[in-house]
Amino acid sequence: MAVFLLATSTIMFPTKIEAADCNGACSPFEVPPCRSRDCRCVPIGLFVGFCIHPTGLSSVAKMIDEHPNLCQSDDECMKKGSGNFCARYPNNYIDYGWCFDSDSEALKGFLAMPRATTK
C-alpha cells in the first residue's frame, strides 16, 4: 500500500526541475543576482556585470585576478596599482569588491550607494 501511494504521488504531483537562466547583464547591487539565487553577477564595471552559473567560477577567479579593479583585499588593490582600499559590494552573493583610493570622492559615493538603494 505504501509503495502504491508513493508511486501515485509522483505521478499525480510531478516535480519539474528547471535550471537557472544565468545569462545577460546584471547589477552587482541586485539581490538575488540575475533574478535567481543559483546565479552570480560578475562585475565588469562598477555598476554593471554579467550573469554566470557557479560552475564557471574557476574562470571567474582568473578574471578577478586579471581585472584591475576587482579585489578581495586592500593588499590586492595595492598590488594591482588601482587603489589602496577594497570596498566590498553590499551583496551577499558577491565575494569581492572594487578598488578605490581611500580618500577619493568615488569611494564616498560607492559607500553611500547601499543606503540610497535601501530607502
Swiss-Prot record:
List S-S links within the chain: 22-39, 26-41, 34-51
The yes or no answer to whether the keyword Signal is present is yes
Look up the coiled coil feature and give its residue ranges: none
State whether keyword Magnesium applies.
no
Q: InterPro entries, per this entry?
A: Albumin_I, Albumin_I_a
Annotated consequence of substituting residue 50 to A = Decreased binding to globulin
Q: What is the effect of changing residue 48 to A?
A: Decreased binding to globulin
Q: How is it modified after translation?
A: The C-terminal glycine may be removed from A1b.
Report the leader peptide range. Answer: 1-19
Instruction: Provide the propeptide boundaries.
Output: 57-64, 117-119
- Pfam families, per database record: Albumin_I, Albumin_I_a
Q: Give the record's keywords alphabetically.
A: Disulfide bond, Knottin, Seed storage protein, Signal, Storage protein, Toxin
The free-text domain remark for this protein reads: The presence of a 'disulfide through disulfide knot' structurally defines this protein as a knottin.
This chain's function reads: A1b binds to basic 7S globulin (BG) and stimulates its phosphorylation activity. Involved in the signal transduction system to regulate the growth and differentiation as a hormone peptide.
Protein name, please? Albumin-1
